[in-house]
C-alpha cells in the first residue's frame, strides 16, 4: 500500500502539494550586513510544512558555491547571491512573479 499525503490525501507518487506550494509562496531575497561588514543573502517566505527547506538550502549552497544555514524557515547564504538565488529558484519551479529581490 503506497504512502498517503497527509495534506491532500492522494498517494505520494500522485501528490502535487509541493508543486502548488512553489507557485503560491511569496519569497523575499535580500542582503543584510552581518558582523565585520560581511554580507549575507537571506531567502525568506517558505512554508516549511510544504517544502523541504533543508534540501532547498543544500541545492542553493551548491549552486552559489558558498556556505549557509537554515534559520526559522529562511535560508541564509554567505555573500551577495541575490541574482543566482533568484535564477535557481525559478529553475526549481518557483513562480518568477512571486519572488521579490531587493
Swiss-Prot record:
Coiled-coil ranges from the UniProt annotation: none
Any Pfam family matching the protein: SUI1
UniProt keyword annotation of Endoplasmic reticulum present: no
Superkingdom of the source species: Archaea
InterPro entries: DENR/SUI1_TIF, SUI1, SUI1_arc, SUI1_arc_bac, SUI1_dom_sf
GO molecular function term, any single one: translation initiation factor activity
HAMAP family: SUI1 (MF_00604)
Family stated for the protein in its record: Belongs to the SUI1 family.
Annotated PANTHER family: DENSITY-REGULATED PROTEIN, DENSITY-REGULATED PROTEIN HOMOLOG
Protein name: Protein translation factor SUI1 homolog
Organism of provenance: Methanococcus maripaludis (strain DSM 14266 / JCM 13030 / NBRC 101832 / S2 / LL)
Amino acid at each position: 500500500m503506497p504512502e498517503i499525503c497527509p495534506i491532500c490525501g492522494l498517494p505520494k507518487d500522485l501528490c502535487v502539494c509541493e508543486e502548488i506550494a512553489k507557485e503560491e509562496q511569496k519569497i523575499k531575497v535580500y542582503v543584510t550586513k552581518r558582523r565585520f561588514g560581511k554580507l549575507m543573502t537571506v531567502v525568506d517566505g517558505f512554508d516549511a510544512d510544504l517544502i523541504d527547506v533543508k534540501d532547498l538550502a543544500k541545492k542553493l549552497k551548491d549552486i552559489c558555491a558558498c556556505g549557509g544555514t537554515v534559520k526559522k524557515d529562511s535560508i541564509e547564504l554567505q555573500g551577495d547571491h541575490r541574482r543566482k538565488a533568484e535564477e535557481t529558484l525559478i529553475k526549481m519551479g518557483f513562480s518568477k512573479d512571486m519572488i521579490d529581490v531587493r
